[in-house]
């Protein structure tokens, strides 16, 4: 399976310009016969909720919105699965989620969304935390999604793996001050679950926030297969070998050697793993 990691900078609050960039990169990816392309956290609007402020609601979208319509059309015309971060409008007035949507060919709207579960810093003031851990069946594989700070919580990645994901995508807006933590977390989640992890970090600045890039595909042994540059935009293409992933799970049996007779992870839908 061939994937593309779209490491981009965004214009804060300018959805039109950001969507135009996303559209252009989707077209480039399709020309390279990519199966899945992933964009960073909040790619359509920029990241900083405190800078967007009360405009968050106006920038938010739900089923059938501008982002959903455009990416559905692109997915269908390009035969491309698209994962993209955006501000999702909730059912209650003023409720917004830091979400990543997924679009697959032959559907008129997004397949679904993952709403960021672990909010950090000022995100907690503006966004509502997610409550669900969905998986998404695409034409090529079963996809799990986490967003940025979610990668620091082993339980989430473990549940995604145990539910049957083939790969985890991690749209992010990670700051350069914590670059070392990013590297360790991404490799650890991949290795301990025997799963490929595609981490897509944005670049650029928003006032005092500096996003460092460094998007990467990590294999099931926790090794980096492809690494984007630091600090500038880049579209990188990667091959994912699920046969190698299966081989790794046989050689490094962390999932099979869990002692569920003495411990478990309980997900609030009452399924235990």
Report the location of each language-model feature.
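Extreme N-terminal starter segment of soluble prokaryotic enzymes
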Residues: 1-5
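Short, acidic/polar
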Residues: 17-26, 153-158
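Cys-nucleophile CN-hydrolase/nitrilase-fold catalytic domain and related Cys-dependent amidase chemistry
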Residues: 15, 23-105, 175-195
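Short polar catalytic/cofactor-binding loops
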Residues: 7-13
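CN hydrolase (nitrilase-like) catalytic-core segments centered on the catalytic cysteine
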Residues: 63-83, 152-235
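Active-site catalytic loop in hydrolytic enzyme cores
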Residues: 90-163, 176-184, 188, 247, ...
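C-terminal beta-strand edge segments of enzyme domains
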Residues: 135, 202-273
């Amino acid at each position: 399976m061939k994937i593309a990691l779209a490491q981009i900078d965004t214009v804060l609050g300018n959805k039109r310009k950001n969507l135009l960039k996303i559209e252009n990169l989707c077209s480039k990816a399709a020309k390279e016969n990519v199966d899945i392309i992933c964009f960073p956290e909040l790619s359509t609007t920029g990241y900083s909720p405190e800078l967007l402020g009360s405009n968050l609601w106006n920038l938010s979208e739900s089923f059938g919105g501008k982002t959903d319509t455009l990416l559905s059309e692109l997915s269908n015309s390009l035969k491309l699965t698209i994962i993209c971060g955006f501000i999702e409008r909730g059912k209650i007035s003023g409720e917004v989620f830091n979400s990543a949507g997924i679009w697959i060919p032959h559907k008129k709207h997004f397949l679904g969304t993952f709403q960021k579960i672990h909010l950090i810093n000022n995100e907690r003031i503006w966004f509502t935390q997610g409550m669900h851990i969905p998986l998404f069946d695409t034409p090529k594989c079963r996809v799990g999604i986490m967003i940025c700070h979610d990668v620091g919580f082993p339980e989430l990645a473990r549940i995604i793996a145990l539910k049957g994901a083939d790969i985890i995508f991690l749209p992010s807006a990670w700051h350069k001050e914590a670059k070392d933590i990013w590297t360790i977390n991404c490799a650890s989640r991949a290795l301990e679950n025997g799963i490929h992890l595609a981490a897509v970090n944005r670049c650029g600045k928003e006032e005092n926030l500096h996003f460092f890039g460094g998007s990467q595909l990590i294999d099931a042994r926790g090794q980096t297969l492809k690494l984007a540059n630091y600090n500038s935009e880049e579209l990188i293409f990667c091959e994912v070998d699920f046969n190698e992933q299966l081989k790794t799970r046989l050689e490094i049996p962390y999932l099979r050697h869990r002692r569920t007779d003495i411990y478990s992870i309980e997900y609030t839908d009452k399924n235990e793993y």
